[in-house]
Amino acid sequence: MCYFLYGAVNNGINDDDYKIAIKNSEYIFNCGDINDVNDCVENCGVEYRITTNHCDCDTAIGQKHTNKEELKSLEKLLLNLKKVRGIKYILISKNWVEETNNKQETVHIDDIDILHFFANAEDNCLYKIELYKKYY
């Protein structure tokens, strides 16, 4: 049995900006919404898996250590995605095979410490990280 990482970005993003943002990233996000990701998780699908790994058991997400390179590359990716025209959010979850998301949380990227957030992410929780520009 294995862990898998799932996720999506909202529809309507600028494709050229997106390609630049994810260049050299190990994570690839298809466009979709909460229902798309949850359906994929429930059916053990692959359309919304965000890695091409056989499994994601060795992921640093949820392992309580903020000094992992994987988390730093994920932080860099999120900061790059923030620059994509039309982006509103990214969805991400870490699920044990055949276990569905039993919880959902929404946060804004400007309100979190990204490394700490991902180091302490819970399994089977779908996180919606809002990336739009906040105006104070």
Question: Where in this protein do the model-derived segments appear?
Answer:
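Structured alpha/beta or helical-core interaction and ligand-binding surfaces enriched in interleaved
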Residues: 1-136
